[in-house]
Design a protein with these regions (language model features):
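Glycine/Thr-rich phosphate-binding loops of Rossmann-like dinucleotide-binding domains
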Residues: 49-50, 71-73
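C-terminal hydrophobic helical "lid"/dimerization subdomain
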Residues: 50-54, 95-148
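Acidic carboxylate diad motif detector
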Residues: 65-66
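Short, charged/polar "capping" segments at the starts of alpha-helices
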Residues: 1-5, 73, 148
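Helix-to-beta-strand junctions that scaffold the AdoMet/dcAdoMet cofactor pocket
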Residues: 56-58
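Adenosine-nucleotide cofactor-binding segment
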Residues: 1-51
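Rossmann-fold dehydrogenase core element
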Residues: 61, 74-114
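Conserved functional loop/turn residues at catalytic and ligand-binding sites
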Residues: 11, 31, 43, 83, ...
Length: 148
């Protein structure tokens, strides 16, 4: 609920708590007749990924950003026949992301509302506790005083 509320405050048109509503019902309510073009799996929830795969448009793209359990089942038949593109985070693509983000920030993108917690790097455990709690947006670890 915390992150859904944060998304609403940041301008999300619709947020969905899958424990309370079915994605297909929400799609119908907002007038969607096809699936999603882009999906971003950030929760690390296997059932959420499965639901996303089943509700993507042909040729849709899914970014896998959450850490899923090792035994997560992926319906490869749906992925193959719907031409879905699943992409994780790896190597040089991360650097490309940094360059794009830098450009977006320089052009005026305000990321401040997404950053909900800041900790000195020496308090990294508190940062991880905030992330794990589900009651945070982005957590920033400040390395400024690492050698003090």
């Amino acid at each position: 609920p915390y992150r859904l509320d944060l998304a609403k405050k940041l301008g999300a048109t619709e947020t969905v708590n899958l424990k309370e509503r079915k994605l297909t019902d929400v799609m119908r309510e907002v007038g969607m007749t096809e699936g999603f073009d882009v999906g971003m799996e950030m929760s690390g929830n296997a059932a959420g990924l499965s639901d996303m795969i089943n509700n993507m448009k042909h040729g849709g793209k899914i970014a896998l950003l959450g850490l899923l359990p090792k035994d997560t089942h992926v319906d490869m038949e749906t992925v193959i026949f719907n031409g879905l593109n699943l992409r994780g985070i790896y190597g040089r693509k991360v650097w490309d992301t940094w360059y794009k983000m830098t450009t977006m920030i320089q052009s005026g993108l305000d990321i401040a509302p997404v950053i909900t917690h800041r900790f000195d790097i020496r308090d990294y455990e508190k940062g991880f506790e905030a992330m794990i709690s589900g009651q945070s947006g982005k957590v920033v670890l400040d390395w400024t005083h690492i050698n003090d």
